[in-house]
Amino acid sequence: MDEASDEDLMARIAAGDEPAFRLLTRRYAGRAVSLARRITGNDADAEEVVQEALLRVWTNAPRWRPLAAFRTWFYRVVLNLCLSRRRRAPFVPLAAAGDPPDPSADVAAAAERDETDRRIAAAIGDLPDRQRAAIVLTYYEGLSNAETAAILETSVSSVEALLVRAKRSLRDKLDEQRRGGV
């Protein structure tokens, strides 16, 4: 069953096949949590969002129609749940706490990397929702502009424009931080 297509698995899930659901979950849960973490800004919300998205897969499987690839549909569900959650609660980046330093690593270099990661995460968190989603889907999840466009329900040219604006905003924000502004 590991070679079964996502569409075949959804048909089996619609019939109540729990092993098919577990397989589909194994295929997508990890990347979905990664996507959700980058959008929501914390692990707990990301886990909850993915659990809710997987529940929707199970409950909506009988009504699911393969108008787009399952991955596109599933990421869209995850993204919508993330954006809804972000609208309810303010963004507090988990990266602000940082990871404990590796005692064997150069502490100064590790601290600088952690600070850079924190600043980038904060700058991404400050982007408008659609720009943030375009950046995360394209650069962190490795999706093509066409796949990102399908998830965001927009055109490829709109995704390209979102990416240009997002990168400009990130560059400006990070340059301002380097100059000591924020």
Regions of interest found by a model, annotated:
Residues 121-125, 129-133, 137, 141-158:
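Helix-turn-helix DNA-binding module
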Residues 59-66, 76-95, 113, 174-176:
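Arg/Lys-rich amphipathic alpha helix in sigma70-family domain 2
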Residues 2-6, 84, 91-117, 122, ...:
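Internal acidic/polar
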Residues 2, 14-23, 33-52, 156, ...:
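Short, charged helix-capping/linker segments at alpha-helix termini
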Residues 28, 49, 162-165, 169:
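Residues within the DNA-recognition helix of helix-turn-helix
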Residues 14-15, 38-41, 52-69, 87-90:
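Sigma70-family region 2
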Residues 12, 98, 114, 122, ...:
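C-terminal edge and immediately downstream basic/flexible tail or linker adjoining helix-turn-helix-like DNA-binding
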Residues 25-43, 60, 124, 169, ...:
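Amphipathic, Lys/Arg- and hydrophobic-enriched alpha-helical face
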